[in-house]
A protein has these predicted regions:
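Cysteine-centered iron-sulfur cluster-binding motifs in ferredoxin-type domains/subunits
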Residues: 30-49, 77, 81-101, 343, ...
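Short, intrinsically disordered, charge-biased short linear motifs at domain edges
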Residues: 20-33, 73-84, 199, 232-234, ...
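N-terminal glycine-rich anion-binding loops that anchor highly charged ligand groups
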Residues: 41-44, 55-58, 237-240
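Short His/Asp/Glu-rich catalytic/ion-coordination signatures at enzyme active sites or charged loops
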Residues: 71, 92, 96, 255
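Iron-sulfur cluster-binding electron-transfer modules in prokaryotic oxidoreductases
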Residues: 103-453
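Non-heme iron-sulfur electron-transfer modules
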Residues: 2-25, 49-82, 100-130, 429-438
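Alpha-helix capping and helix-loop boundary segments enriched in small/acidic/polar residues
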Residues: 34, 53-57, 75, 251-258
C-alpha cells in the first residue's frame, strides 16, 4: 500500500478536531478544506492573486490561513482578517479546483468568526448596522430611501450637484457610481401590492414565486418589471409573497451570519407554499441556494427546511430555458457580448441558458467575451469597501470587452452597476442590459408591430 493510500485509509478527513483558535459558534467546516492539497490550480482563477501576486491573497493561501487558525498556529487578528476580507468570494477557485474545495464557504464562515471576535466599532460599526440591520431587511424603509433618491434625481438637485462640481469632493469610485446610478422607478412590490398573484397572459401552465429583492426592487425595478412580464407571457402565474425580505447575502458576506439566518428563516416561511422560487439577481439566487450552510450547526428542523427551500430556487434564465418559452418574432438588431455573473456561473452553474435566450432573439449577434466568467469587481459591496482592488479587477474585465459590441448583457444588478462604471471610466459606449430585459423588449416590439397595447 502506498503512503497516499495508507493516509486515505487511516487518517480522518481532518485532524484539527478542536478548531483551536475558533472560539465562537458557527465555526469553519473542516470538511471543506480536507481535500485541499495546495496544488495551485486555483491560482490563475483568482482575481486578487492576479493583481497582488501574494500567496495570502490566493485561494490556496486563504485556505492555509483558515486551517492555521484551527490548528492553533494563528490567532483571529488583523493578520488573518485582511486577506479573508480581501477575497471577492467570486467562487472561480471552486470551479477551477479538481477537488471542488468550497473556498467561498470557508471564507464566509471565517468572516463570521472574525466579526464575533472583532466587531466593527465607531462610525464603521454604526454605518454597517444602519444598512445591514436598519435598512435592507425593511422593504418600507427601502422604499422611502428610494423615494428620496427619486426626488434627488428628478427635482434638479442631481443636475445642480453635477454642474457645481460637488462630485469632485467625493471619492472617485463613489462619484463614478453616482454618475451611472439607474433612475428610480415604481417598485414591483408597490405596483402589484393589491395582487396576491399576477396572472399569466393566456393559459396558465405553471405558478412560480418571485424574489423581488431589496435593493433590486428599488434601484432596478425595471428589471423586476420585465421579469414579471416575461414570466406571465410564458404562461406563469407569478406570486410575489409580501413577507419576503432581503436574501441576506450582504450580511453573510460581511460576517453577520446571525442576521443572515434570521432573514433566511423569514424567506423560508414566506415562500413555504410554493414549488418554484424564481430569482433574477445572481447574488440573491445563489444565497438562497446556500441557506442550508447557515443551519449546519442548527437544529434539524431548520436545516431540513433550508434544504427543501434551496432545492426550489432557480434563476429566471434557467427556468425559462428548462420549462419552455415563446421565442420572440420581432428583431432587436444589436451586436452584444455576455458577461457571466460569478454567482450565476460559478455559484449556480448557469452559463449556457442565458446565452441561448439571447440568441433566440432575432437580430441579436453575440460576440464572445474572453474570460467571460472573470469577476468584474462588484462582489456585493466590495467595490465600495475595497475600491482599489475592485478597480483593478474591473480594469482587467474591461480589457476583455469586445470593442465592437453595442451592449453587454448579464444577470446580476451589482455587475450591471460595476460594468456601467467601467464603461464610464474607460470611455466606452456600450449599453448595459439584463438578459431578461432584452427578451422583454423583443416581446414588446412584437406586440407593438401587431398593434397590441
Amino acid at each position: 500500500m502506498s503512503m497516499k493510500e495508507k493516509d486515505i485509509v487511516q487518517e480522518p478527513p481532518c485532524s484539527s478536531q478542536s478548531l483551536n483558535n475558533y472560539l465562537w459558534k458557527d465555526k469553519p467546516d473542516e470538511d471543506k478544506w480536507a481535500d485541499c492539497v495546495h496544488c495551485g490550480m486555483c491560482l490563475e482563477a483568482c482575481p486578487t492573486y492576479e493583481i497582488t501576486g501574494q500567496e495570502q491573497h490566493s485561494p490556496r493561501g486563504r485556505v492555509h490561513l483558515i486551517k492555521s487558525v484551527a490548528d492553533g498556529k494563528l490567532e483571529v487578528n488583523e493578520q488573518f482578517m485582511d486577506p479573508v476580507f480581501a477575497c471577492l468570494d467570486c467562487k472561480a477557485c471552486t470551479t477551477a479546483c479538481p477537488a471542488d474545495v468550497d473556498v467561498g464557504g470557508l471564507i464566509e464562515e471565517a468572516r463570521g468568526q472574525i466579526r464575533q471576535a472583532m466587531p466593527l466599532t465607531g462610525w464603521r460599526g454604526a454605518v454597517s448596522k444602519f444598512f445591514l440591520h436598519g435598512l435592507f431587511p425593511h422593504p418600507g424603509r427601502l422604499q422611502s430611501a428610494g423615494n428620496l433618491l427619486k426626488l434627488y434625481q428628478k427635482s434638479g438637485v442631481q443636475t445642480a450637484v453635477r454642474k457645481t462640481g460637488l462630485l469632485k469632493i467625493m471619492p472617485e469610485h463613489l462619484a463614478t457610481m453616482e454618475t451611472v446610478m439607474p433612475k428610480v422607478k415604481q417598485s414591483v412590490r408597490k405596483k402589484y401590492n393589491k395582487e396576491e398573484v399576477v396572472k399569466a397572459k393566456g393559459e396558465t401552465k405553471n405558478e412560480v414565486a418571485f424574489l423581488v429583492g431589496c435593493v433590486m426592487d428599488v434601484m432596478f425595478s425595471d428589471i423586476n418589471d420585465s421579469t414579471v412580464n416575461v414570466l406571465t407571457r410564458n404562461g406563469n402565474d407569478v406570486a410575489i409573497p409580501k413577507k419576503q425580505t432581503c436574501c441576506g447575502a450582504l450580511h453573510v458576506h460581511a460576517g453577520d451570519r446571525d442576521m443572515g439566518r434570521k432573514l433566511a428563516k423569514q424567506n423560508i416561511e414566506a415562500f413555504g407554499h410554493t414549488d418554484t422560487v424564481v430569482a433574477n439577481a445572481a447574488g440573491c439566487g445563489c444565497m438562497l441556494t446556500e441557506y442550508p450552510e447557515l443551519f449546519r450547526e442548527e437544529e434539524t428542523e431548520w436545516r431540513e427546511r433550508a434544504e427543501e427551500f434551496a432545492a426550489k430556487v432557480v434563476d429566471v434564465s434557467k427556468y425559462l430555458h428548462d420549462s419552455g418559452y415563446e421565442k420572440p418574432k420581432a428583431e432587436i438588431n444589436t451586436k452584444l457580448t455576455y458577461h457571466d455573473a460569478c454567482h450565476l456561473a460559478h455559484g449556480q452553474g448557469v452559463r449556457q441558458e442565458p446565452r441561448e435566450l439571447l440568441l433566440d432573439i432575432p437580430g441579436v449577434e453575440m460576440v464572445p467575451m474572453p474570460n467571460a466568467d472573470r469577476c468584474c469587481g462588484s462582489a456585493g459591496i466590495y467595490n465600495i469597501t475595497n475600491p482599489e482592488m475592485a478597480d483593478g479587477v474591473l480594469e482587467s474585465k474591461m480589457e476583455n470587452v469586445p470593442e465592437e459590441v453595442e451592449m453587454i448583457s448579464m444577470g446580476n444588478p451589482g455587475c450591471m452597476l460595476q460594468m456601467a462604471m467601467g464603461v464610464e471610466k474607460y470611455g466606452r459606449n456600450q449599453k448595459i442590459v439584463h438578459t431578461i430585459q432584452l427578451l422583454d423588449w423583443a416581446y414588446q416590439k412584437e406586440d407593438k408591430q401587431r398593434g397590441q397595447t
